[in-house]
């Protein structure tokens, strides 16, 4: 009884980001995790200074971030060196990330500003290079599209921007 509800397009309020495009050389040192002793990886960076919520906001089938208002909304994480401050949300997040990695829709490496108990288990169990605790904040110093290299040796991770992107 009564008229059907009217659905309108409620565009999400953009989540605040402090990221600005960087163009100076950048290299920093961080930490690895005990389950990983040595690795080298390079690739294109996908960067945000806003936490990522895997459960409900990263499509489990495609790896595309689907969080209206998030700076990376609509962007796939597949084959990226994924750089973000930390995960957020449920303790189910590692299982979502593990599924993405297992099916080939996950990142090739994960860099967190802070050690992340929602991200670390998936990276550790499936052998995805994981780094955290950098001297300088990679979420503000690396641009999406930068070519980066990471090397873990002796528990220390070196992150270096090899080539800067021309746009963010």
Describe every region a protein language model picked out.
Residues 3-25, 163-167:
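Intrinsically disordered, low-complexity terminal tails and inter-domain linkers enriched
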Residues 25-41, 46-156:
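Feature captures the catalytic cores and cofactor-binding loops of soluble hydro-lyases/lyases
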Residues 155-163:
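Generic recognition of long tandem-repeat/solenoid scaffolds
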